């Protein structure tokens, strides 16, 4: 996002984009969205949807023009980004049409690939959206390739995203992404797509044990489990 001062100073706008390495930028005053051409084409659609989310959520615009004691808090900006992501998912996945399709088949990575083609979004955003709408206990991990993590990999925060279905939250809320990623590291192999699969037993909040099927692929950008 950017405020009025950025829109009125093109030179500053260029420096702003380069210094902060932005993939997308929303100019509220002009109702204009800028997308970096360096961003892979499949991801540009998501970036545009995300910035549209900022535009259509009423309270995001005023915040882009300045900060007060509330908006300076980190959790405020985290909330804004989460809301923009939610808006993007609702726009790009056609609201409840995606949920109907998502629940029409077993929740496998093959099904994710089918939904990706049907709705025209990236594998990663489709995967994220599928896990969220499942009506069974399920989770998803979005990470680096387990066998060749990036330079900024953090052992204590190994997952870029840890997605859970509502029933997983209510029944397995004590399970952490670190625990699950440790399992992924054990079964994953070197590869460019299919990294492996396994079954694991997780204990719920009541002490009952359930078997979960886990599978991981790498789509050149993210490892999806």
What do these predicted regions represent?
Residues 1-225:
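Active-site hotspot residues in diverse enzymes, especially metal/ion-binding acidic/histidine motifs
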């Amino acid at each position: 996002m950017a405020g009025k001062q950025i829109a009125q100073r093109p030179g500053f706008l260029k420096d702003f984009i380069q210094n902060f390495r932005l993939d997308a930028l929303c100019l509220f005053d002009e109702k204009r969205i800028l997308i970096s051409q360096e961003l892979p084409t499949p991801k540009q659609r998501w970036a545009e949807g995300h910035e549209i989310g900022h535009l259509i959520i009423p309270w995001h615009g005023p915040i882009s023009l300045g900060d007060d004691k509330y908006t300076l808090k980190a959790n405020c900006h985290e909330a804004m980004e989460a809301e923009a992501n939610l808006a993007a998912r609702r726009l790009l996945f056609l609201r409840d049409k995606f949920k109907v399709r998502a629940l029409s088949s077993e929740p496998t990575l093959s099904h994710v690939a089918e939904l990706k083609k049907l709705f025209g979004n990236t594998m990663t955003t489709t995967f994220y959206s599928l896990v969220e709408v499942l009506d069974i206990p399920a989770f998803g991990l979005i990470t680096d390739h387990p066998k060749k993590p990036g330079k900024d990999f953090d052992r204590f925060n190994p997952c870029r995203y840890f997605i859970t279905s509502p029933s997983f939250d209510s029944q397995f809320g004590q399970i952490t992404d670190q625990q699950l990623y440790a399992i992924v590291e054990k079964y994953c192999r070197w590869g460019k797509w299919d990294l492996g699969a396994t079954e694991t037993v997780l204990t719920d909040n009541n002490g009952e044990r359930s078997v979960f099927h886990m599978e991981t692929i790498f789509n050149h950008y993210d490892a999806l489990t």
